[in-house]
């Protein structure tokens, strides 16, 4: 069901080094960022817009009927970009919740996008995100797979204690692959972007640690699978096969 006080923002820019022009790469005749936009719209949880500093991305999104907000080019992170976009799109401050959806998740399921809102039913939670259980040793030890360590709240939610590229936690039991999809309360996003980068954030190269180090609460919804991001040519070919199928 559409939530009029929720805004889904998809930050998109041309900065990828391994896949130049990534947001506009063709998947079945449609730019990748448009696939993400369509999946966000299919989630039917609120207004959806692409936030970009690149006119070519804006033109492509508008050509497919999507909403665009232009942002500055010098933002240090996607969170800063969506904060500027929020201020531009909603100066009346009617939006209460902002979802930050990466523009390189063309195969994400609409229900997964909606699932990120569930932890915010608890008023003590500042930021919500998602994770899925890890099932292979390769995934568990891969430093490009971010692991979330947390305390269970029931069977489908964690309270995040730490995010790391290391294999963690130690010992027997499940480990969880963090999915880079966030839902912020508006006040939490505003507080987050005002904070300086934190020591652990800089050490792990994980922006979400800034919030934890500042005492903000991040809860994690557990979903059944990790949506496949597109970071390499092989990822792109996989996405093309999935979306052609």
UniProtKB/Swiss-Prot annotation:
Pathway: Nucleotide-sugar biosynthesis; CMP-3-deoxy-D-manno-octulosonate biosynthesis; CMP-3-deoxy-D-manno-octulosonate from 3-deoxy-D-manno-octulosonate and CTP: step 1/1; Bacterial outer membrane biogenesis; lipopolysaccharide biosynthesis. GO terms for cellular component: cytosol. Its EC number is 2.7.7.38. One of its GO terms (biological process) is lipopolysaccharide biosynthetic process. GO terms for molecular function: 3-deoxy-manno-octulosonate cytidylyltransferase activity. It is found in: Cytoplasm. Activates KDO (a required 8-carbon sugar) for incorporation into bacterial lipopolysaccharide in Gram-negative bacteria. Belongs to the KdsB family. This is 3-deoxy-manno-octulosonate cytidylyltransferase. It comes from Rhodopseudomonas palustris (strain HaA2). The gene is kdsB.
């Amino acid at each position: 069901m559409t939530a009029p006080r929720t805004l889904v923002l998809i930050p998109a820019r041309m900065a990828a080094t391994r896949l130049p022009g990534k947001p506009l790469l063709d998947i079945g005749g449609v730019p990748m960022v448009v696939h993400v936009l369509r999946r966000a719209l299919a989630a039917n949880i609120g207004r959806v817009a692409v936030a970009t500093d690149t006119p070519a991305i804006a033109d492509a999104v508008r050509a497919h009927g999507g909403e665009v907000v232009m942002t500055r080019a010098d933002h240090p992170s996607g969170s800063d970009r969506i904060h500027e976009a929020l201020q531009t799109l909603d100066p009346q401050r009617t939006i209460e919740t902002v979802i930050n959806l990466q523009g390189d998740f063309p195969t994400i399921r609409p229900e997964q996008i909606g699932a990120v809102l569930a932890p915010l039913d608890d008023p003590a939670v500042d930021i919500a995100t998602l994770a899925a259980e890890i099932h292979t040793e390769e995934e568990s030890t891969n430093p490009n797979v971010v692991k979330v360590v947390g305390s269970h709240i029931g069977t489908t939610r964690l309270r995040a204690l730490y995010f790391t590229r290391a294999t963690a936690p130690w010992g027997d039991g499940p480990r969880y692959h963090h999915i880079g999809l966030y839902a912020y309360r508006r006040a939490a996003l505003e507080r987050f972007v005002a904070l300086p980068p934190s020591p652990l954030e800089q050490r792990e190269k994980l922006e979400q640690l800034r919030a934890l180090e500042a005492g903000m609460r991040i809860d994690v919804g557990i979903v059944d699978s990790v949506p496949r991001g597109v970071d390499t040519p092989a990822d792109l070919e996989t996405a093309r096969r999935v979306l052609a199928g």
